[in-house]
Amino acid sequence: IEDFATKVPQSMKSEYAAPLFCAGITAYKAIKAAEPELHKKIGIFGIGGVGHMAVQFAKVENCDVIAFSRTQNHLDVAKRLGAMDVMIFSENQEEFLGKLKEKHGMLDAAIVFAPADIVTDTAIKSVKKGGLIVIATVGENPAFMAFEEKTIRGTLIGTTKDMEQVIKICDEKNIEVISQTFPLESANEVLKKLKDSEIEARAVLIP
């Protein structure tokens, strides 16, 4: 079992560490997949339990982050955590892309955490020719123009080595983890809250 365990510093609280083993490593791998050393202007689509951590990992890599969400409170969180700019996502794709291009031009890379095909399709169209799209959610792959030479890459989870890096970065860089704690016996109620979007980011159950 030691091969699959990751040591957590004694100074790190369990309720802080718990989300790192799901949301944290997913966010970290998505940023690494976006090749931040080459792509500095990164759009993050979906600022929830995973996206808010991705904003911070991208900042550690000195990227300019533009965050997109349907809800203003998520955008406020992204801005507080270091996003260069934030924009409300709109399903009016032409209008949304027009505003993005006017403010920032085309993105070097886009990362999709929101599980909606319209979001993925919009993210693909927001990236410049030769750019990179990382899909970190499950959904259909919309059609895209091959002659634009864009790369689409999927990612969901990482390795034990990746997890060690997540713990190290979060410990050294004071990455903020947004979560709410609940007693273990309220698990069913918490699942309903998650389903109804009543929890801002992640829920942690305490025995």
Language model regions located:
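Rossmann-fold NAD(P)-binding glycine/threonine-rich loop
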Residues: 137-150, 155-168
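NAD(P)H dinucleotide-binding glycine-rich loop of Rossmann-like/cofactor-binding domains
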Residues: 1-45
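Glycine-rich Rossmann-fold phosphate-binding loop(s) that bind the pyrophosphate
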Residues: 23, 46-50, 138
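C-terminal hydrophobic helical "lid"/dimerization subdomain
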Residues: 121, 163-207
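Glycine-centered, small-residue-biased loops immediately flanking beta-strands
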Residues: 131-132
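Helix-to-beta-strand junctions that scaffold the AdoMet/dcAdoMet cofactor pocket
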Residues: 127-128
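Residues forming the Rossmann-fold NAD(P)(H) cofactor-binding site
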Residues: 52-55
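Adenosine-nucleotide cofactor-binding segment
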Residues: 41-47, 59-122
